[in-house]
């Protein structure tokens, strides 16, 4: 009888000890599990943000590239103008579609103010640039001026600036910018900046060269600044 009671007592103590060990392990492991889950969610969010950032960067690059067909239209001969205008229209349609798709992507991933800027401020700025390009292209050759051409070019610069504003603030407002994926954020932003700065070097002096005039001091300074920024980037 005594042996049975002692055995039951030992079993009870072992059972209590096991419970204490299990509870202790839970207390030790739960914070680790929570931290691992939080790290996983941060990594998942960073992956989403990098994808969003890449899409916005593609849009900014395409807005920058729109200057090429726009410049072709503005500098074309009457014989080639109709062909270049059609190319520009097709390019603009693709950019407009990309703006809509990118705005929807931003909304789906929580970047609501950024999507609004894309759909409103950027659209308005881009329209101003395109209107200036079209106005210059519609002006008779004999009535054109370097000031009007430069105005159109500067307006297209402003459209890109508006798109780059979105890219910059998507990066700044991203959760993962302080994670191990932060390098990707910086690289995407710098490459976008580099591509546009390189394109502006020639565009800033294009109007004066087209009309065989002396390059204005401001345009020359801007072109040199673009060169320096592209070099440092």
Regions picked out by a protein language model, each given a short descriptive name:
Residues 2-233:
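Hydrophobic alpha-helical segments
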């Amino acid at each position: 009888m005594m042996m049975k009671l002692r055995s039951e007592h030992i079993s009870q103590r072992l059972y209590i000890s096991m419970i204490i060990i299990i509870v202790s392990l839970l207390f030790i492991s739960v914070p680790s599990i929570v931290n691992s889950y939080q790290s996983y969610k941060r990594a998942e969010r960073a992956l989403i943000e990098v994808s969003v950032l890449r899409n916005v960067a593609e849009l900014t690059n395409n807005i920058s590239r729109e200057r090429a067909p726009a410049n072709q239209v503005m500098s074309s001969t009457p014989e080639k103008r109709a062909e270049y205008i059609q190319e520009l229209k097709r390019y603009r349609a693709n950019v407009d579609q990309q703006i809509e798709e990118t705005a929807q992507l931003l909304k789906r991933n929580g970047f609501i103010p950024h999507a609004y800027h894309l759909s409103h401020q950027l659209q308005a700025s881009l329209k101003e640039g395109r209107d200036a390009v079209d106005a210059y292209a519609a002006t008779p050759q004999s009535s054109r001026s370097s000031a009007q051409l430069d105005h159109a070019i500067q307006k297209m610069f402003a459209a890109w600036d508006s798109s780059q504003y979105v890219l910059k603030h998507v990066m700044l407002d991203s959760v993962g910018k302080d994670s191990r994926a932060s390098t990707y954020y910086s690289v995407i932003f710098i490459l976008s900046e580099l591509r546009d700065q390189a394109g502006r070097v020639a565009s800033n002096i294009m109007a004066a060269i087209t009309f065989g005039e002396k390059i204005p001091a401001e345009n020359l300074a801007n072109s040199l600044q673009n060169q320096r920024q592209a070099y440092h980037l």
